[in-house]
């Protein structure tokens, strides 16, 4: 399957976000995980798990869902411009394909995140693939990532942590 993608695209980026809520205009990305596959379908050295300080209180429901703690974000979170630069750099190439499970959610957050920082131009050359749309064509409801992981017998964890969800989506 990957071979056919690289007939059209020069790289594939798989990403996932964890956020402070569900509104991409007012909530923030708190964790951005992504990896890049080269033309051979091999992971490059550009696997990232970036934690971002939201600059405000983290809703307790988000900590319950993800296990991400506010203190960990404030202590270890990177500046937003550093995170944006790392992601835009991963889009290097003429025709990148950005993939995500439930891509509409992640890409909406990513667009607003990059737009606020004046970096959204990097997305213009990318094309997008929603892995959930493929799963929906093949399996009955429900269509959460955990259902896809279970249905396909993928080893790994869907933990509402960006890096775990990226690896699950890749499989």
Which sequence ranges carry the predicted segments?
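Short alpha-helix plus adjacent loop in nuclease-associated cores
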Residues: 127-143
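Hydrophobic/aromatic-lined pockets within catalytic cores
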Residues: 114, 139, 171
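Acidic, divalent-metal-coordinating active-site segment for phosphoryl/phosphodiester hydrolysis
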Residues: 161-171
